[in-house]
Amino acid sequence: MMRPVVVKEKQIHVVEDEVRQAKTMDRDIVKHAMKQSVAKLNPKVMIKNPIMFVVEIGFVITFILSFLPSHSSSIPGWFNITVSLILLFTVLFANFAEALAEGRGKAQADSLKQSKKDVFANVVKENGEIVQVSATDLRKDDVVIVKQGEMIPSDGEVIKGLASVDESAITGESAPVIKEAGGDFCSVTGGTMVVSDEITIVITSNPGESFIDKMISLVEGAARQKTPNEIALNTVLTSLTLIFLIVVVTLPIFTNYLGFQIDTAVLVALLVCLIPTTIGGLLSAIGIAGMDRVTKFNVLAMSGKAVEAAGDINTIILDKTGTITFGNRMAHTLLPVGNETIEQVGKWAAISSVLDETPEGRSVIEYVQAKSISYNRELAEQGEFIPFKAETRMSGVDLQDGTKVRKGAVGSVIEWVRSQGGTIPKDVNQKADFISKEGGTPLVVAVDNRIYGLIYLKDTVKPGMRERFEQLRQMGIKTVMCTGDNPLTAATIAKEAGVDEFVAECKPEDKIAVIKAEQDKGKLVAMTGDGTNDAPALAQADVGLAMNSGTTAAKEAANMIDLDSNPTKIIEVVGIGKQLLMTRGALTTFSIANDIAKYFAIIPAMFTLAIPQMEALNIMKLTSPLSAILSALLFNAVIIPLLIPLAMKGIAYKPMSSNALLGRNLLIYGLGGVIVPFIGIKIIDMIVGLFI
């Protein structure tokens, strides 16, 4: 009775340790980000963000002015230094947001670097001699033998043997995967370990070009480039900043004409409040955090452009097998023929499957047991198993008493029964056609010269796929299923799964044709694949998600790689892309809406003394002109760190149409962006008013 308690206590301690380590790591990331926020004050770094660079220049100007005698009697000596400090913290907060996002990526890179240990490889020379060399000395096309318990030294493809490989260092999945020569599962990754048997691989990458090297480079941000959307938005924001800069610089000309002067510090404060500093300070963090969210989802995006493109996808091309369906045909029901009973069909179907280790064979046993149909297992185990062959298209067992039991393709079993001198029941082909039209695969069960019935094998649609496709439909995304099945079977699966369109008897070149046809309509297309024959289509698609278990050609052609090798993850990737675009759009809306309240705070404060009628614009009833300016600046600075969690996590995303999303975001972040600063500035003014 005590052992389960002990196990639970151990599990609790493990969880507590993991939580403690996560908190420690978060503290380390925050500390590093705080240091980096100061280091990023370097003008060479700041100029990459023109908006915050203008704020930094404003800090320098007001800081210098604080040590010079003031020519304005209305501006006290402490005002300039206060403004300069607020501007400094505004820049520091923006730098902190970017450094925090980068820090999370670097933490992931550090964990990946731990998997790059000093590894030695057994290289096979041309003369057959085996030489041990360091993994760093390996070059492309070198042939290496990797034995049980050894680390795979670099990326490669299996050319001989079969082995179980532990890829947990890369994918986080503890269950080993089978790698073998030929086919779509020959690709191996450096840093993974062979846990059984032995394989010979040919190296496919030079030092510094391996999969792990690329991952480290990407998550560290070294390879990160601004996306087209990010560049376009940055250009718009920079243009706004330039326009407001011209307005502020020329403003003294008009105020002199009106007979009064505006202090330089007030002009700087006006400029900072006018320009979109909120989104300017968070823009880089949003992009980096978007990449980070994809990486945490165990998907490696080759660029931020790929993540953004996922958010704009209009069409998704999906393989049926393994994506929409489980890929394993399972026994769905039994159909007796002639005067036979379902118990007789089940009995002989089970006997033919006892020694059959295929998923189909096991599913027959499970079905018969679930239906409580009795059969003699020992009788089958004592017989001689006849495995499935492409030539015969049948499998079964020859019993010790000479009885021959077979199950297999309709035509093959019918031909075999006729060769035994048997007759064919009239309803065999009729029931076989019925199964095919239902989207299933018929297997005929026969004993010697007598057919007993059919096994209805069905490739089951994964649970929840219809609901997920409905969500995509609400988002305006069309789903297209590609399958090698005949049109009848394809139509049945498509209807059951709820996809919009399907392509039956599809060949690899047909996928490219489908992608090009959609792109010719102005659509952005995403697809998944794992084989060499998928590589051209993955390269053609706007978003190509390759499986990590697939071939090197597929992974090189794609712009995203799923480390878990789960094709359905393309749906989640699209959601992350949309969340990234929505977060950027929502915070841009919020930032620009903020300016409305800041105008009502700072503009009356600047002009009330010269133009008393401007007091009518002081709808917030702020304490004094100086208090109004400082309150607007303080809110402008404080809102950046308050929005960092939202920028990092992304705004809540729900599948809906583009128009519905636009209306929702305008209501929440547009109207909210107007209301929040009115409240925030008023509260800050009440506090500041106590001290001035």
UniProtKB/Swiss-Prot annotation:
Lipid bilayer topology: Multi-pass membrane protein
Subcellular location(s): the record lists:
Cell membrane
* Alphabetized InterPro entries for the sequence: ATPase_P-typ_cyto_dom_N, ATPase_P-typ_P_site, ATPase_P-typ_TM_dom_sf, ATPase_P-typ_transduc_dom_A_sf, HAD-like_sf, HAD_sf, P-type_ATPase_bsu_IA, P_typ_ATPase
EC main class here is translocase
Q: Where does Mg(2+) bind?
A: 530, 534
Q: Which residues cross the membrane?
A: 50-70, 74-94, 240-260, 266-286, 600-620, 628-648, 672-692
Stated EC number for the protein is 7.2.2.6
Primary role: Part of the high-affinity ATP-driven potassium transport (or Kdp) system, which catalyzes the hydrolysis of ATP coupled with the electrogenic transport of potassium into the cytoplasm. This subunit is responsible for energy coupling to the transport system and for the release of the potassium ions to the cytoplasm.
How this chain assembles, per its entry, is: The system is composed of three essential subunits: KdpA, KdpB and KdpC.
> In its UniProt entry, what is this protein called?
Potassium-transporting ATPase ATP-binding subunit
Q: Which organism is it from?
A: Bacillus thuringiensis (strain Al Hakam)
